[in-house]
């Protein structure tokens, strides 16, 4: 959530919400119907009724587009048509829907009741409503507490040590995350949605020492991922996975080739501004990650019949998705001509501005077009109020002057006045 900028997702907020709600529902029902048709066939060795089939599909209905961002970031690739913020919004907001579907289906199966449409709508509305309100409330409250601490610390002289302030604010945010999730869950809301909204609000505030806080959160993210995959690895039995390998392969191929594309095209049908190529690529990069595997442990905890097979199938499908889709992200985007070759990839110069300065940092990659009037800074047409602080050429960093000869491919670190706080770091 903290990495999601409101200014970036605003143009794609409606398509993103459609993918994370209607898209998840359609993926679950389409794939669940296919699993139900496979059940009972002698060679599949799975025997699921309709609701358990739907439960299996629901656990796999959310995507892990963070893996896509990692691949794009490592290759320094920029996407056209606002595809990056669209996937960012979808991946951040579709886990709550998949979680609610999983919980509702588990409760229905264990209680032996019928699945009521009105009951599902009521529970979804309740969890979304409480989760959204708690996320906004906790985000605003945490932001004000951080601002109060920063003001009080500066007044007392405690704010003179940036590392101390960064540590305290990071701990405050971490505590707010746990409090937000637990309080929302206690109120019968969706804790995942509340934490995501809280993170969005905090990430769009002008937090002091933002770079240090971001690094702390990245470290915590990696730590949590290591713990999660270690625990999941302890639950896996390779022999049991082999027993369901054939049917898992069929389910995975169906979800990749039919289930996900069909749900994406239906969800995005009202939005005529999204091109066919964009829809095809969004359909292809619906990677499954750790979240579906975690959701598949819920039926095991609740002793749902066939829970062991559900876990093994989800684990197999996730590995298949990462193997097939994860290795073809870049080449599929290139085939569909969705890579923006004109955009300069983000470059981290390791420079951060003070929070009270009404300025921001930008990175510009030079091409022949920018050097048509000359190859020095004094001959370039820079925006008013801009100043070049540093030039990167290959692996060298240079402090520029008016006579430095620039060449295509140079990266300029530019400081500019009067901009929004969304791009204060470079």
Feature locations, PLM:
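Transmembrane alpha-helices that form the ion-translocation and gating core
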Residues: 9-11, 15-75, 142-145, 238-316, ...
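Alpha-helical membrane-inserting segments
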Residues: 1, 26, 30, 34-38, ...
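Membrane-interface alpha-helices at helix entry/exit sites of multi-pass transporters
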Residues: 79-90, 94-101, 118-119, 211-215, ...
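Membrane-interface junctions of multi-pass transporters
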Residues: 3-15, 146-172, 177-251, 271-280, ...
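Re-entrant/interfacial helical elements at transmembrane boundaries that shape
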Residues: 66-75, 79-88, 98-109, 196-199, ...
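Hydrophobic faces of alpha-helical transmembrane segments in multi-pass integral membrane proteins
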Residues: 18, 22, 26, 30-31, ...
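Long, charged amphipathic helices and adjacent flexible linkers at domain junctions
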Residues: 341-364
């Amino acid at each position: 959530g903290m990495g999601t900028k409101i200014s970036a997702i605003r143009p794609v907020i409606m398509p993103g919400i459609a993918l994370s709600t209607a898209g998840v529902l359609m993926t679950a029902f389409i794939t669940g119907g296919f699993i139900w048709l496979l059940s009972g066939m002698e060679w599949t060795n799975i025997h699921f009724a309709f609701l358990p089939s739907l439960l299996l599909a629901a656990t796999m209905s959310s995507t892990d587009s963070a893996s896509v961002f990692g691949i794009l970031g490592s290759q320094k690739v920029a996407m056209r048509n606002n595809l990056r913020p669209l996937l960012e919004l979808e991946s951040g907001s579709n886990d709550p829907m998949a979680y609610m579907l999983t919980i509702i289906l588990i409760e229905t199966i264990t209680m032996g009741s019928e699945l009521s449409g009105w009951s599902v709508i009521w529970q979804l509305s309740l969890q979304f409503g409480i989760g959204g309100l708690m996320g906004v409330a906790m985000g605003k409250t945490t932001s004000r507490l951080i601002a109060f601490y920063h003001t009080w610390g500066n007044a007392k002289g405690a704010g003179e040590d940036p590392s101390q302030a960064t540590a305290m604010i990071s701990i405050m945010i971490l505590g707010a995350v746990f409090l937000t999730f637990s309080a929302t869950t206690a109120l019968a809301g969706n804790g995942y949605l509340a934490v995501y909204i809280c993170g969005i609000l905090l990430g769009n505030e002008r937090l002091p020492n933002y770079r240090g806080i971001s690094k702390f959160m990245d470290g915590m993210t990696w730590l949590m991922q290591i713990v999660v995959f270690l625990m999941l690895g302890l639950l896996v039995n390779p022999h049991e996975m082999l027993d369901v390998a054939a049917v898992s392969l069929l389910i995975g191929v169906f979800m990749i080739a039919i289930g996900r594309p069909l749900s994406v095209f239906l969800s995005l049908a009202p939005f005529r501004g999204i091109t066919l190529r964009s829809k095809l690529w969004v359909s292809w990069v619906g990677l499954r990650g750790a979240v579906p595997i975690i959701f598949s442990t819920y039926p095991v905890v609740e002793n749902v019949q066939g829970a062991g097979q559900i876990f093994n199938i989800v684990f197999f499908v996730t590995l298949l998705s990462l193997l097939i889709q994860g290795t073809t992200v870049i080449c599929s985007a290139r085939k569909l001509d969705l890579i923006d070759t004109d955009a300069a990839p983000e470059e981290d110069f390791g420079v951060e501005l003070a929070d009270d300065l009404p300025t921001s940092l930008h990175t510009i990659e030079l091409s022949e077009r920018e050097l048509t009037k000359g190859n020095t800074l004094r001959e370039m047409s820079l925006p008013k109020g801009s100043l070049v602080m540093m030039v990167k050429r290959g692996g060298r960093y240079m402090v520029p002057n008016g006579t430095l000869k620039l060449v295509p491919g140079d990266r300029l670190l530019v400081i500019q006045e009067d901009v929004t706080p969304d791009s204060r770091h470079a």
